[in-house]
Design a protein with these regions (language model features):
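Conserved alpha-helix/loop element of class I SAM-dependent methyltransferases that forms part
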Residues: 16-36, 50
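A short acidic, Gly/Pro-enriched loop at the edge of an enzyme's catalytic core
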Residues: 94-105
């Protein structure tokens, strides 16, 4: 899904904010070792902005999306918050415009179910992660239908995600509870393959 300006209200609705408590998310991010984070499918910055604010003086955030309106809105918000640690990139292909092995953490928040060619997408994330780097993936759980979010039929089962992570080369998959109605996993790019 490419985000348009009419989607902005839904992306930051009170319902979403109550379901996805950003402090719980930041607690998990705080527990991980990283200096540079790529937020893939960043939209208008639901995850990007809190990460950048929390670590404004010490860490870099690369925000990546396909949507021009979303990135323009994110750029305005970054400017208004005076966040000098955010780099905004637009992708127009299946290749993420980030150098090989250059980030320590990749965040995928409510994005994976939208992706076509999921295995190739995970291989692309593997490419940009440094050896030892972490993928953090949060997505809608098909086993918990709360009446919001994408249709259950569009959601990716946990076992399918875990299988794709393994096929893409990731190891050390760990399940974390962060948000109701979602699953959350971290996975590592191994130091040696």
């Amino acid at each position: 899904m490419v985000i348009s300006a009419r989607d902005f209200a839904k992306l930051e609705s009170p319902e979403r904010k109550s379901l996805q408590n950003i402090d719980d998310f930041l607690g998990l991010v705080r527990s991980l070792r990283w200096r540079t984070c790529a937020d893939i499918g960043c939209g208008i910055g639901f995850y990007t902005l809190p990460i950048a604010q929390q670590w404004r003086n010490s860490r870099k955030i690369i925000a990546v999306d396909r949507s021009t309106p979303a990135l323009e809105e994110l750029d305005k918000r970054v400017d208004s918050l005076e966040l000098g640690n955010v780099q905004i990139l637009q992708t127009v292909s299946d290749r993420i415009p980030i150098e090989d092995a250059s980030v320590d953490l990749v965040n995928l928040g409510n994005v994976y179910h939208e992706v076509k060619g999921r295995l190739n997408f995970l291989k692309e994330i593997y490419r940009i992660l440094r050896p030892g780097g972490t993928l953090l993936i949060i997505d809608w759980d098909p086993e918990e239908d709360l009446g919001i979010g994408p249709p259950v039929s569009d959601r990716i089962p946990r076992d399918q995600l875990l299988q794709n992570l393994e096929f893409a080369g990731f190891t050390d998959m760990k399940d974390h509870f962060v948000f109701v109605g979602h699953y959350t996993y971290t996975a590592k790019r191994p130091i040696k393959r």
